[in-house]
């Protein structure tokens, strides 16, 4: 098969190679592996405590007995399906099935409680598929261009992007920037426990072997979202699954579109701006090595708030479909974008693509600038499989919605018991350390009381996830610059990002609390958007 060069703009050859990739995926054995990947990915994403990275790690050695295109294709499909499926448990139980779905809990679970379960899941399905498809198309046609962009970036830029993400955390704190910032800083502090990533020196371990390995963010996620919600449900005596989510339940929009694969225009009309902007933005975030789909979801949620009228923006966090569509579009696009540095530079864009890189090496293949030319059939098989996986997610909209709607028929006591079981098993299975169970219980109880006093736990978890990504880039940048902080302002991209981070943090305070903000909105015609 002739392999076209995307960089040369040979679009017809790219399409020809992509068609050949589809043909390869549709062979009986590869098609079987494709459906295995979809099933494993959705299960690992939807079950609390499991995640796509863990499943890819477990399946990677098995691929050694397969042809490279078959095995690596299956791993890519598992990743794509798991990123989407993480939203299912986030919506049903307020338990993110993957770190990428943390932001989805903010509106997905309240929609469930408001009787809009069908609408929430259906919105997540469509937004995930749309973001994944657009991200994969950008990957196919523009990966060399994006790789050139990524290779120009270094530690100052990576730190600046994550700093901007941390600044955006202040917008998700239930309207209280001070409390959100406090929780985010606490999460950053939790991220420094363990061994120093650059020097190997123990920090805040208190001579404890357990703390030397750091605080696992999966354990914290299970505690603050799952176990705390169980405590809340026991105390309130309410229903974990909101009423009205069944047939005939939900809003008019739900009745018109949820559970149907024949109404994409309804979604495009309502979420068009969010889908378009967040697909591109999520892909670009995914291209940055180390940023990953979790960062993409954070950017997507906050961008989504700025792409809707003020009347909708003020309801973010209380259960609006836009709050589900925004992060789901971005995180699935970012998952596709993470393949750009992997395939073109040999640099993983996320934890899961790092495992997929290991699978490449296991098969004697080293990703890099010449991979598309030397391993064209393999690369285009992966491209085709990613497209098919996201289309499959869209086509599975109706059966997936109907399947998960059945959860509301499970007795409340049994459902809470199952969540506790999955939470305990998930906390232990992550690292096989019994002390993680006590950590999970501790954070669960703490989150229960924090939320009673209106402290949002999401900023804390985001701080814990992003902190360990930001610290090495910050310290390497300062080491190379001899401790000169101006290194972040001498590079255009990092200077712009840090400036945006400062503005992102302070402008909402000015715009929302002063007459000056009202005059600015009137001067630039922003009052129309806010109606």
Task: Specify the residue positions occupied by each region the protein language model found.
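Membrane-embedded alpha-helical modules
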Residues: 122-238, 362-512
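A structural-propensity feature for long, helix-poor, extended segments
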Residues: 79-91, 97-98, 319-345, 349, ...
